[in-house]
Amino acid sequence: MSNAIAVSEANFQAEVLDSTIPVLVDFWAEWCGPCKMIAPELDALAAETSGQLKIVKVNVDENNDLSARYGIRSIPTLLLFKGGTLVASHIGLADKNALLAFVKHHIYSLLPPLYTGAFITAYKHQ
C-alpha cells in the first residue's frame, strides 16, 4: 500500500492546485495490477524527494469527474503539476529512477533557488 495522500474532488484544489511544491498525481484503481506494481516505486520516489515533491493518489473508480476532467483513459496515469499547472503526464509503469528522471526533465528548470540538498543532487547525478 502506498504512503501517498489520497485525493478526491473535495481536496484536489488544496492538495494539488494550491500546493507550494510540485505534485505528482497517480490516477489508479484497486483492481489495476500495474497500479499496484508502481506503488512501491512511487513510495521510493516520495522518500527520496521528501518535502520537495508531493505524491498523491486519485482512485479513478471513486472520482469519475476528476478523472474525466484530466482525460484519464489508461491507468496508471501520472500527472505532474507545478504551481497549479499541469506540466506533464506519464502513462504506464516506471521504476523510481525513471520517475525521478521524468520529474527532473519537466520541473528541474522550474525549481526555485530554495530547492537544495538531496533532491537537486539526485537530479544532477541521474
Explain the meaning of each model-derived region:
Residues 3, 8, 28, 54-56:
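Conserved Rossmann-like nucleotide-binding pocket used by diverse enzymes
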Residues 60-66:
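Structural microenvironment flanking redox-active thiols in thiol-disulfide oxidoreductases
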Residues 34-49:
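Typically the conserved alpha-helix immediately C-terminal to a functionally engaged Cys/Sec
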Residues 74, 79-111:
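Non-catalytic, surface beta->alpha helical segment in thiol-disulfide oxidoreductase systems
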